[in-house]
Amino acid sequence: MDHYRPSVGTKISELDTPCLILDLDALDHNFDRMSETFKDTKVKLREHTKNIKSPALAHMQIRKGGTVGGVCSAKVAEAEVMVEGGIASVLIPNQVVTEDKIKRLCVLAGRADVTVCVDSEENVRDISRIASNLNVKVGIAIEVDTNMDRGGVRSVEQGVHIASIANQLSGLNFRGVMSHSAMFGVPKDDEFKNDERLRSRFVFA
């Protein structure tokens, strides 16, 4: 049986929500602008699917050029949707730590080129164990904390240690490091004096 889909010409007031409604001319213009920005550079774009939500739109953007040929998805469930829709490369820029989700991650890695971020030796070993059992390879990128306090290593030594472990274990492909845009402000002197945690965020030359 075919899945129900709203027909062309359905009134906006009759559409179920949530519903993706696009101005295709504006979408095409935006994709062209992004493609033109990146296509002649060494830096390529990996669109985050929280912006587009749809494998069809991801394919449209990839065809425009200027991308790495894949997307970024916040969690395993979103990555599954993208791979099911034919996207060949997915980066998950967060840690995947529970046994069940690591298994789903590894199953996905058997269908597409999948990279996930890590910030602990324990997580790296868990992913390696499950990936090896399923005879797949999972890409590993070390997340670097850039003062967002969301995750990531906070020292060069920690990052080097995790990288060396990842390079030694089976079932893994070490891909490098990843970080979010740095979050720096200019705190007042008294804030430094009274907040040791704040002081630890800043390195002065």
Question: Where are the model-predicted features located?
Answer:
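A generic, well-ordered mixed alpha/beta core segment in the N-terminal half of proteins
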Residues: 91-92, 97, 101-147
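Active-site beta-loop-alpha junctions enriched in small/polar residues
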Residues: 52-54, 74-77, 95-97, 119-123, ...
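Distinct, well-ordered alpha-helical segments
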Residues: 57-62, 102-106, 124-134, 152-163, ...
